[in-house]
Amino acid sequence: NGVLIDKGSGEFNKHGNDSWAYDQRGFDFIMRDQFGYNYAIKDQIFSNKSRDKFQRLILKAAANDNFSFEDGAHIRDGYVHSLSQTAGLRVDERSYTACIVYLNGNYWGVYELREKVDDPDFLDYYYDQDEEWVNSPNYIQYLATWGGTNTEYGAPNAQPNWDTFKNWVLGNPMSNQANYQIAKSQYNTGSLIDYFLINIDITILLLNYNLLIVLL
């Protein structure tokens, strides 16, 4: 509505993979207090979230759901994440709102403004997992997988700790209640269940289409 909410200065990092095939590429914005304006964007940007301070945000033009890519709809990823939040599922979503991006004062396109989940501020706000100090025993452990798995926080212990837990789960039957309770005490099994539920629900039309092809 033309009302200035907040302003600041910061840096930009590359974000995404598929989106970099287009002019409207994805990027991360990082507000820098050192630049003398502000340490964070201070506003409740996402209507379904109470959080009102953001140092890092994602801006992307729907990635491979872009208008020019195979009948792209430009809203599907944001829709699924918003649906998950509305349903109260136990998964981490990139909160979504639409925005307009201008590059050097020129209109650049319709973008998505998204909450960044692999961010210490996100983990602190929603899970009370503060950064503390690097390499401390309580430092955040965070793995990210896209093609391969890499450690974003908590090196060198994060990957070995995950591998140890994963191998224990694979080596012990989860049908055993005692084993399952041990796993549940260390892993949010409800989050995994909800993740599969929403994926099944969203892809069911594609599944029916594939079955139809097989039957024909």
Give the ranges of each region predicted by the language model.
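Conserved NTP-binding catalytic cores of kinases and kinase-like/nucleotidyltransferase enzymes
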Residues: N1-D71
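Short, flexible loop/turn elements at secondary-structure junctions
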Residues: N1-G2, K14-G16, M31-F35, A61-A63, ...
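Extracellular structured ligand-interaction cores
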Residues: K7-S9, Q24-G26, F54-R56, H81, ...
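ATP-dependent phospho-/nucleotidyl transfer catalytic cores
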Residues: Y39-G72, E112-I204
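Aromatic- and charge-enriched substrate-recognition/interaction segments
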Residues: G72, H81-G88
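Solvent-exposed, polar/charged alpha-helical surfaces in well-ordered, non-transmembrane soluble domains
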Residues: G78-S82, D163
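Short, well-structured beta-strand/strand-turn elements
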Residues: T86-I100
